[in-house]
């Protein structure tokens, strides 16, 4: 009977020690070979455009030239300003780039 209790405690000790050990996890990254950017259209980039860089498909975070121009357009209800400090600091959340300036008397996303 004592041997069964001993085995139970040893087994419980092994289980507790196993649960305390941190097992490192690896983050997986999808690597697709490519020759042109067209080869990367199936890469899941969550709204970011994929590009072929050094023979591998990569998700980019850069804005296109047109997106930057669209972001520069002032809104009809844009606040007037003399200095950038006159603009509402919460405006950065509505700008794609996250930054703004006082341009030609209006608070404008950059």
Curated annotation (Swiss-Prot):
It comes from the Eukaryota. It is found in: Secreted. Keywords: Antimicrobial, Disulfide bond, Fungicide, Plant defense, Secreted, Signal. GO terms for cellular component: extracellular region. Residues 1-28 form the signal peptide. Its main location: secreted. Disulfide bonds join 34-52, 40-57, 45-59, 81-102, 87-107, 95-109. GO terms for biological process: defense response to fungus; killing of cells of another organism. Belongs to the DEFL family. This is Defensin-like protein 296.
């Amino acid at each position: 009977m004592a041997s069964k209790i001993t085995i139970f405690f040893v087994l419980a000790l092994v289980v507790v020690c196993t649960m305390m050990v941190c097992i490192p996890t690896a983050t997986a990254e999808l690597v697709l070979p490519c020759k042109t950017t067209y080869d990367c259209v199936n890469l899941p980039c969550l709204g970011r455009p994929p590009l072929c860089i050094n023979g591998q498909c990569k998700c980019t975070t850069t804005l296109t030239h047109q997106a930057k121009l669209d972001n520069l357009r002032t809104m009809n209800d844009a606040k007037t300003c003399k200095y950038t400090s006159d603009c509402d600091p919460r405006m950065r959340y509505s700008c794609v780039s996250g930054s703004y300036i006082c341009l030609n008397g209006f608070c404008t996303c950059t």
